[in-house]
Amino acid sequence: MQLQKPLKIGLGMMGAGLFGIIFGWVLFPVILKSQLKKEMALSKKTDVRAMWEKIPFALDFKVYMFNYTNVEEIMKGAAPIVKEIGPFHFDEWKEKVDIEDHDEDDTITYKKRDYFYFRPDKSGPGLTGEEVVVMPHLLMLSMATIVNNEKPAMLNMLGKAFNGIFDEPKDIFIRVKVLDLLFRGIIINCARTEFAPKAVCTALKKEGATGMTFEPNNQFRFSLFGMRNGTIDPHVVTVRRGIKNVMDVGKVIAIDGKTEQDVWRDKCNEFEGTDGTVFPPFLTEKDNLESFSDDLCRSFKPWYQKKTSYRGIKTNRYVANIGDFANDPELQCYCDSPDKCPPKGLMDLMKCMKAPMYASLPHYLDSDPQLLKDVKGLSPDANEHGIEIDFEPISGTPMVAKQRVQFNIILLKTDKMDLIKDLPGTMTPLFWIEEGLALNKTFVKMLKNQLFIPKRIVSVVKWLLAGVGFVGLVGSLVYQFKGKMINFALSPSSAQVTKVNPEINQQNQPKDISIIGESQNPPKVDM
């Protein structure tokens, strides 16, 4: 039996609709997910691998310095008064070198290299980097703190060494140009032959003090970031490529061949999370992210905050903080013991950086209120000083990121050294940094073309085909039953008429039917 043409068309439309439903709601999500798994893994010759190896645009690296305005009063025990100066803006270019793939366990090893370029045009109004700031002498205060903690009897000798190395300083503060402190370096005179200066300089060289380079004629040079600029980091990092399981992409599993640190206690020595440059796809609001910071020797676990958008792309915002080590059981292993944790919002970096510094959020945001009371001139603001990352959830791409951290030190007070015997003994800020990322138009367009435009096209087509199928289904049903409905309507047997006989009175005469009232005559209307 041959199908009639209208019925064929209807069935064809129904087939198109069925295809739209199967492809749009079943097959396409599977295909998209499979393709994303391939693209997001760190396999060779993919766009993600290329960007992971060398980020093709500069990150924003901003430094904010704290200038101390009441040095004489601080030396007598007064609370510090600070004024923030910044930002000093640097373009930061990041790349990975000495890259090796290991197919057998789906890992990749690499070293890091960063370059920094000062940008006065992007810095704060009028800032050139040649501004002189007054702040606690990080090197002197660090050495005094370490000696006080380990060999307090040696503080007197250290004071004599300071007189030789730093030319008899009148206080524990330094007056220094910003770029000298950050990158160019300040000279430490270790050419003195007296016992105390020579002993201290020998110890500095032997220990390889953080941020120190050694030049001819016993001249040392100290800076905060100079050793990182253009220098290959010696540490070898091992991460998962994510080819076998894309949810493991970028996950740190070893540094220098060691599968855990030997810095903290217990679980805090574990490497948890990615290396911070790549994240797994298919993020949901319930997912807790993890990334490991080798600068701070710890993992961070940002949590979902709210829905956001960036350049027309829907994103999820995740935020993080330093934490409350004393009251969070998961963080107590960062302390020497649970009863020796720093105040809320502070992290002791001595074991990690070999320097008696503390990390916090800028301006002591989300920290113990006492920290703000001990320093004047700080104004914490969640928008300006928090850690936040906006992710595109399907691909796991960070669209916007602002990672901020402040470095602090205790103004050590001890009677065993005249230079610091009257200091307030409180925590005080030194500087804070912001490392920022915002994908430019080129990479946003690339993401849209590869992910969102195909997704939208399929979304339109699947609904269009589903609509065509519905119309075809209705049309086929109408056509199929049209003849039966017409025949049913025109058939004599389909319309039965019931005969109504007039009511007969007692005289066998039909009753009259009254229309209005009791009279056949219309009522008279008075005018």
From Swiss-Prot:
Disulfide bonds join 268-333, 297-352, 335-341. It is found in: Cell membrane. Pfam families: CD36. This is Sensory neuron membrane protein 1. It comes from the Eukaryota. It is a multi-pass membrane protein. Plays an olfactory role that is not restricted to pheromone sensitivity. InterPro entries: CD36_fam. The lineage of its organism: Eukaryota, Metazoa, Ecdysozoa, Arthropoda, Hexapoda. Belongs to the CD36 family. One of its GO terms (molecular function) is scavenger receptor activity. The chain crosses the membrane at residues 11-31, 457-477. Keywords: Cell membrane, Disulfide bond, Glycoprotein, Membrane, Olfaction, Receptor, Sensory transduction, Transmembrane, Transmembrane helix. Glycans are attached at residues 67, 229, 440. Residues 32-456 are extracellular. Detected in both male and female antennal tissues. Expression is two to three fold higher in male compared to female antenna. GO terms for biological process: sensory perception of smell. Its main location: membrane. One of its GO terms (cellular component) is cytoplasm.
